[in-house]
């Protein structure tokens, strides 16, 4: 279900690009005057990441994801009905909040369920997002069609922005769009998101107790000594990585046409091969993650991105090198983000606020770096600024990850030593417990033997007293025969084995009857 939700997330995010011209026509604006809707969505995404980071620690995961997807559904249904640019920007901001919560909550839920063993699931989650982003233009093409889109683009380009804005002010805030195909494109994705949200609500009603178990188990996880430093460095790591990824994907077309001298069809193919290898390697990473550690995958990704970006800079006008290096660069960038999230979970626990922190870093990189590169590219059109950015970001991530690894593993070695000490102490305690058990058994056996001895002594005392009473009664008889037999009985009594030394036997005094001679 998480993969299904991220498939819808990819569709929701990517559908805006192919339908941007039609949205501009719907609000009677041209493209240049409507580009700030992306800024509104990005700010909403940042706010949603922060809000989701707090809510995911106090709410049920399924409930939070269901609510965020329901809000996304409402936004998708209302966007085509917006008739003013301001209302469309506000709607995009709310839409960004919902997808920010969904993005943060989905990543945290993967970590909460599978922990540091969730690398394949994390790769599958982000592959679903890439698949949705790949399918969105196809869906827009099927819904809108090339003819309607072309007509809308031409119409929006020739109308002046001022006249369109005055026409927009006279219209209502909401209204049925003139192009029904635009409505269907967003309605299909919105319906899909609604169905997935219903399933999440059902999971919340059915398995609400599992949330507490997952949160209780997460609280017992480890916390690195340099937890805050790791999060800050990971913030920078994702800032450079996501910024370079979005920058190259956004500007490779213009770079290929203006700097490398490619035709538009070839430049479009170069752009497609970047995103195609990106999505394909995210799919293959699901299987690679079962046999490779996340840290290994990050190292391989850094090596691939550094090598390919270096070749891009050195051979920036060679078409063959551009094709090969671009495909390698797209493949190398595919697994870095999900591998980074899975890797950090191996060393320190990632809760909602922590996940929101490095997601914000990725979002800021997505906004800031492309904006700066756009300005620099305009000032220095003869320089391959996009390629320099890719190389610089690869160097930055290549330096940051060893530092991250050093900070993460040093406390872990100490922790392992402490764990070994605790295990030894447990072993000693268990062995001492065994000794105590043996001593208790010995004491019980000794008590049993003592009880048997006491029983024997009591038996001996009883028999001794009975013999004494018998002998006394026999001595009182005034017959010579009994007296003559008594010494032998006395001797038998004195040599009897029942005389155990613990009780002193007194010799009987000799009594003689009158008128008898010995």
From Swiss-Prot:
Give the matching SUPFAM superfamilies. Answer: MFS general substrate transporter (SSF103473)
A GO cellular component entry from the record: apical plasma membrane
Transmembrane feature ranges: 19-39, 53-73, 82-102, 107-127, 139-159, 221-241, 307-327, 347-367, 376-396, 400-420, 438-458, 466-486
Entry GO MF terms: symporter activity
Q: Could you tell me where this protein is found in the cell?
A: Apical cell membrane
Q: Where primarily located?
A: membrane
Tell me the GO BP annotations in alphabetical order: sodium ion transport
Compositional bias annotation for Basic and acidic residues? 414-426
**Residue ranges with Acidic residues bias:** 436-448
Membrane topology per record: Multi-pass membrane protein
Region Disordered, annotated ranges = 414-448
Q: Which UniProt keywords apply?
A: Cell membrane, Ion transport, Membrane, Sodium, Sodium transport, Sugar transport, Symport, Transmembrane, Transmembrane helix, Transport
Q: Name one Pfam family in it.
A: MFS_1
Family named by the database record: Belongs to the major facilitator superfamily.
Question: What is this protein's function?
Answer: May function as a sodium-dependent glucose transporter. Potential channels for urea in the inner medulla of kidney.
Name under which the protein is recorded: Sodium-dependent glucose transporter 1
Upper taxonomic classification of the species? Eukaryota, Metazoa, Chordata, Craniata, Vertebrata
Chain's gene name: MFSD4B
